[in-house]
Structures are given as C-alpha cells and as structure tokens.
Amino acid sequence: MSFTIQTVTFTAPQPLGALPDSRGRFGRFGGQYVPETLMSALAQLEAAFNQYRHDPQFLAEFAGHLRDFVGRPTPLYFAERLTAHWGGGRIFLKREDLNHTGAHKINNALGQALLALRMGKRRIIAETGAGQHGVATATVCARFGLECIIYMGVHDIERQKLNVYRMKLLGAEVRPVAAGTGTLKDATSEAIRDWVTHVETTHYILGSAAGPHPYPLMVREFQAVIGRETRVQCLERLGRLPDVLIACVGGGSNAIGLFHDFLDERAVRLVGIEAAGEGIETGKHAATLTAGRAGVLHGAMSYVLQDEQGQVQEAHSLSAGLDYPGVGPEHSYLKDIGRAEYYSVTDSEALAALSLVCSTEGIIPALETAHAFAYLGILASQLHSEQIVVLNCSGRGDKDMGTVARAMGWGKEE
C-alpha cells in the first residue's frame, strides 16, 4: 500500500493528483483560515502526516488494520438487475457499505487514529452528522484505548438515534450541540472550539475532506484506497478503466476517495451528486456546488451557501450526512476547472431511488448514497450498453430506517 500521488495524463498546469500546493491550496481554494492558537497544531499535524505518509512501518500497520479490522478490499459488485432496469451502461457498485461500521468513514478514522498515537495525542474529538463518522471514530478509539468525544447536532441526534446508541456503546461521550440548526455545521464549529481549548492534548479527527490544510489532503489520502482498489478491480475483472465514476457529495470524502486515482485519466468522467433537498428554487437544499459561491467556512476557502452579505445560510437535506452548507476545497477546484461534474437531486428523488435499489438488488443504501443512485437513473439513459459506471456505495441504510419510515408514512395509526 502506498500514499504516492498519481500523476499522468490530464492536461492542466500541473498534474491534478499533485495538488494541493505547498500552501495547502487547490487553485484559489483551501488554505488555513483559523485562530492563531491552532496554527502550531496544524503545523505539527502536517509535519507528522508528511513524516509517516511514506513510512513503511506506518503504511504496513495501516494496511494491516484495513485488511483485518475493516475488511478491505471491498467488493466491486455488478448490479445486474439495476443495469437491466435502466437499460444504459453496465453498473458496478464499490461496496463501501460492507466495511466494518457500515461506511467509508472508517478508512479515514483509522488512519488519523494511528497518526494521533504517533503524535502522543490520546484525547480524540470528532464531529458527526449522519453518525457514521462518529461511530467510526468511536470504534477506532475503542480499538486503541483512546478517549473519545463526539459532537453532534441535536436535530441529527433525533434522526440518527441508532448511531448515537452505537457510539455510546463503544465508549464515546456524545455531546449534543443545540446552536444554530443543530446539524453538522454546528457540530463542526463546536468541535473546533474544543480543539482550540485543548490543542496540546487533543487530536481532532475531521471526518470530511474539508477544513484547514492539511485535513483535505490527509482525509483524501486515507480515503484514496477506494479509488486504488477500484482501478485494480476494473482492470483485473473488466480489462479496462470505467467510463464514469459517481458518488454523493456532502463535504466530499467518499467522492474524492473514489475520484483521486482517476483525476489525471481524462477519459474517465467524474460525477458528484449533492442534495437538492426540497428543491433548489425553494432555498431549502444543500447543493453547495450548484448554488453556492466562494467563501470561507471551517478554516478553508471553498464553495459555501451564503446570502448577499456573505452570511452562511442554513442547509437542508433529508440526509443528515449531506446537510452541510460547505464542501471540500478540492471539489470546489475540480468544479471550477471542469474536471468533475456536479448535479443535485431532491429528497423525494433520493427516497424513490432508495426504494428501487432495495427492491431490485437487495441492498439498503444510506440516504446519502441514495442521492447518487437517483442521478444514476438519469445518467444511465445517456450511456450505451458497453459503457462502465462505478457508483460508490458509500454506506448502508440501517441508520436511516426511522427517517425513511416517517417519510414513507409507515407506522401511522389508521
């Protein structure tokens, strides 16, 4: 296993896989917009990451845990009945939902926990929206005997109770955040406040490819195993690379993990799907790359949902993991240069897609993942039968059954 960055064919000022630059920038995006008290911690983190990202012992330990604890590599599954249903390209699913804890989040949480141990930081904090990153962080903290504190918005706690119970069972302290809308943005803000106060003893395991440098780089590199496996599996099984990669995008870690190994393969389309909520025109959505503009949120320059005065707007999505008014800086850059395409689907479209996938493939995807499935139905009609599409099935939907049941009207008294 290696963290060596892929470079080759895409015609850009420099290979896309080589970004960010030395200042932590993806073009105009990224950087470090944080209080002075965090600058030394970020410098320490960057130095540690650069030291260990190529260290054979660290990489061997990381790879061993990914294999034996997480269960990698995850399968590349041919969705035969979905392929027949939509009648377009051949659809394959990268089954990140089969990881230990049920999503891609464990890849990054594991990598950062190993890094924290080497930095001597035994108090771990994290933010979570859908709860999957919180569960993954609590899991690795239990595995390595680390103190674990998870910040979660009160609204998300209500709609993701199952994951709250899992975190507590794993030994984590779950701290409710009532500020703002009580969702992921507010949980992230509270986690950053904690980090500022306890910076000497605490490592913040940020869950998405967002935040100040080096987090977007570091999270991407720990998640890039998704794309590396996909490349190998496609070549071994199909004899060539896929034509299209598609993934849901909130902050963007599962998507960039899939995309990264293919950034400089310009024949491969990269498609990210955001949450349109109740519709872009209603203002109740989380489609940052569709309707946002450049701004600063949680320590980095990226696309942000904001009003005319530059105030961050509330995001809305039925999916707690996509309910965020920002996005990672690398996705912002890929949008600007046209290397990746970004679209959005509504709550109702995601629910319909979730039902379809359940009934045709016997797979219950997370609501986040269901957004990618919803657009896949549109995309499939544009493809011929020999084209290959790989969708990142980023998580399983057990956690969403309460939300789905309420949305479907199940369980109501007649």
UniProtKB/Swiss-Prot annotation:
Stored Pfam families: PALP
Pathway, per record: Amino-acid biosynthesis; L-tryptophan biosynthesis; L-tryptophan from chorismate: step 5/5
Example of a GO biological process term: L-tryptophan biosynthetic process
Signal peptide per UniProt: none
Top EC category: lyase
One MF term in the entry's GO annotations: tryptophan synthase activity
Gene3D superfamilies: 3.40.50.1100
Reactions the enzyme catalyzes: (1S,2R)-1-C-(indol-3-yl)glycerol 3-phosphate + L-serine = D-glyceraldehyde 3-phosphate + L-tryptophan + H2O
Cofactor(s) listed in the protein's UniProt record: pyridoxal 5'-phosphate
Assembly and oligomerization: Tetramer of two alpha and two beta chains.
Protein name from the UniProt record: Tryptophan synthase beta chain
Organism encoding this protein: Gloeobacter violaceus (strain ATCC 29082 / PCC 7421)
Name of the gene encoding the protein in the UniProt record: trpB
